[in-house]
Amino acid sequence: MLGGGSWGTVLAHLASLNGYEVTLWMRDEDLANQINTEKINGNYLPGLSLKDNLVATSAIQEISNSNSIIYCIPSDAFREVAISAEPYISVETNLVSATKGVESSGFNLMSKILSEIHPENPIGVISGPNPVSYTQLTLPTK
């Protein structure tokens, strides 16, 4: 999972609840350390207890063995992070955008950016009105 905000943390949490080993990448090393030691994301979701199979990191190369990567990066930083992650992603890795919005220059969708950087990879999108509060509680969205 790329992006340790509320949406990225909730999606990583849901994957961990389903038994997956999850690496949650974020730029903030202190927050990554807090998640690993206290099992909470105090900046965004202080009431959500995270599982032991969810590990946070600020080292982007830690994604190198991932079968699938979900991008939960703000749209204004999406391309920069996608380019930074590119050397650590194999052509077999499934890539999914869970980022809202479009790129400010050119109005590109995030999936278009991924297909430009990773033309051989399978690419998907998670979209729709998914309030973090519903998703965090594993409730169906309305």
Regions found by a protein language model. Give the residues of each.
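A short, hydrophobic C-terminal helix/tail in secreted or cell-surface proteins
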Residues: 138-142
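Short, conserved active-site loop motifs that form the nucleotide-linked donor/cofactor pocket
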Residues: 53-55
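NAD(P)+-binding Rossmann beta1-loop-alpha1 motif at the extreme N-terminus of oxidoreductases
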Residues: 1-48, 58
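Rossmann-like NAD(P)(H) cofactor-binding subdomain of soluble oxidoreductases
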Residues: 50, 61-64, 68-137
